[in-house]
Amino acid sequence: MAHKKGVGSSRNGRDSEAKRLGVKAFGGELVSGGSIIVRQRGTKFHAGENTGLGKDHTIYAKVDGRVKFEVKGAFGRQYVSIIPA
């Protein structure tokens, strides 16, 4: 008979680090050029006027101004624009 209890090891117990995705500047908010507006996976939001789209689909402001979210087109796409202030 075993004099020690057999102790199994769990193969679970790990998780990936949160990626901090989401909207960083909301509608009507003043932002400066170069600031991040949305961090996302894929294009849930599309880049509108005065905004750029990074290679990881991050939308950023190209000019200083106010953030504007709008739904356009037949497919109901969400666009993020900057209205220069």
UniProtKB/Swiss-Prot annotation:
Q: One matching Pfam family, short form?
A: Ribosomal_L27
Q: What keywords does the record list, in alphabetical order?
A: Ribonucleoprotein, Ribosomal protein
GO:BP terms for this protein?
translation
Q: Does the keyword Ribosomal protein apply?
A: yes
User: What InterPro entries does this protein's entry cite?
Assistant: Ribosomal_bL27, Ribosomal_bL27_CS
> What GO cellular component term, any one, is given?
cytosolic large ribosomal subunit
Question: Is the keyword Secreted in the record?
Answer: no
The molecular function terms of the Gene Ontology recorded here are: structural constituent of ribosome
NCBIfam families in UniProt: L27
HAMAP family the record matches: Ribosomal_bL27
- Recorded protein name is Large ribosomal subunit protein bL27
The gene it comes from is rpmA
